[in-house]
Structures are given as structure tokens and as C-alpha cells.
Regions:
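Soluble catalytic domains of membrane acyltransferases
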Residues: 38-196
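Basic, amphipathic N-terminal segments that precede the first structured/catalytic domain
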Residues: 1-42, 103, 125, 141, ...
Length: 196
């Protein structure tokens, strides 16, 4: 019976991931994106209640929500992948749902890499949650002038300042990529990217 209980919890976790993805991906443009973020955090709380975890140090979080929360981005787990190829960033959803949401009533504004043009399912999901997008080496190549690059960076700074003006936390993985063979979590934190 114990073995079945683990399988059942894993099944409930995966079903919850599917439910979350379908709700977010199929939401309409008219939906309030902050309300959708809160609903998604509540749904992820239910998902993470199916798996064992330990959180330490909540008492060390700042009282004010207007902070930048950095984390090391772990690689996706294949068995959590959806049929359409979407891979959840489970680590960032955990931080938002189980740490920031209970503390601040807000899972934070997340920054995500811009999806490649072949990842339409990913872009739609994060766009509906109103994430701030940044281009990384894992995004499609941008053929842009220095002036265009400067404008893109300026837009990012304006967007993030708007988040602080709303007294919301900002969540980012500044390493610029997920965990890989040459960038394993035991070797983290790696050096931050210049300007991070």
C-alpha cells in the first residue's frame, strides 16, 4: 500500500500540472493576469502538497515584498513534461507558490527567457501569466543594432521598476540558463552574469 500511495501522489501531482497548464494556456485575453497568477499559485500549492519538501529560513525573508529574489534554475525533469512538450520550471513555481505567495500574498513577477519560435506552447503559457521576457542564448537569435539592444534593456528596467512601484517582488534566475552537465547545482552558485 505504501508503494501505491507514492504512485498516487505522483499521479495527482502530474494531473495538477496538466490542469494548471490547460487553465493558463486556454485563458482569454480579457482575463485579469494578476488574478490568473494568484489562481495559478494556489493550484501549484495543491500540486506541491503531493510531494515531500522542506523549507527553512522563512523568518529571514524581508518584511517588504519589493525585493529581487534570485535562485539557481534547475533543469526540467522529463517525467514532468506534458504531451505538447511543455516543461514546467518547477523550481520557480515552487518559490512563487510555497515561499513568496504565503509570505507576501503575491508569488512575484517572474522573468523568463524569450521562447524560441518553435516553443509556441511555452510562450503562450508565460505570456498569459504576464511574465517579463528577456532574450538569452537559449532564445532565438536577435539580429539587432546596439541601439536596439540598448532600447530592449531600457524597456526591461522600466518594466521591473513598474513591478517595484506596485510593491511586488521580482523573481529571476540570473545564471541565464537551466542546470546542465557543465553547470550542476552542487557547483552553484556559479558566477553571476556581468550586470546581473
Amino acid at each position: 500500500i505504501d508503494a501505491l500511495s507514492g504512485i498516487e501522489r505522483k499521479n495527482r501531482f502530474f494531473k495538477q500540472l496538466n490542469k494548471i497548464y490547460n487553465r493558463v494556456a486556454n485563458s482569454y485575453d480579457s482575463i485579469n493576469k494578476q488574478a490568473l497568477q494568484k489562481l495559478t499559485n494556489s493550484d501549484f500549492i495543491k500540486a506541491f502538497d503531493q510531494v515531500p519538501y522542506v523549507i527553512k529560513g522563512m523568518e529571514n525573508l524581508p518584511d517588504e515584498a519589493t525585493n529581487i529574489f534570485f535562485y539557481n534554475h534547475l533543469a526540467s525533469i522529463e517525467e514532468n513534461g506534458l504531451a505538447n512538450g511543455h516543461q514546467f520550471s518547477i523550481d520557480s513555481h515552487f518559490i512563487s507558490a510555497k515561499i513568496l505567495f504565503p509570505k507576501y500574498g503575491d508569488g512575484g513577477q517572474r522573468i523568463a527567457r524569450y521562447s524560441r519560435n518553435t516553443e509556441f506552447w511555452r510562450y503562450n503559457y508565460y505570456e498569459n501569466l504576464d511574465y517579463i521576457f528577456v532574450h538569452t542564448p537559449e532564445s532565438d537569435y536577435l539580429n539587432e543594432t546596439q541601439e536596439q539592444k540598448k532600447k530592449r534593456k531600457s524597456k526591461l528596467f522600466i518594466e521591473t521598476q513598474n513591478i517595484f512601484d506596485q510593491n511586488r517582488p521580482l523573481v529571476i534566475a540570473p545564471e541565464g540558463t537551466s542546470e546542465t552537465e557543465d553547470n550542476l547545482t552542487p557547483n552553484s552558485p556559479g558566477p553571476l552574469k556581468p550586470g546581473a
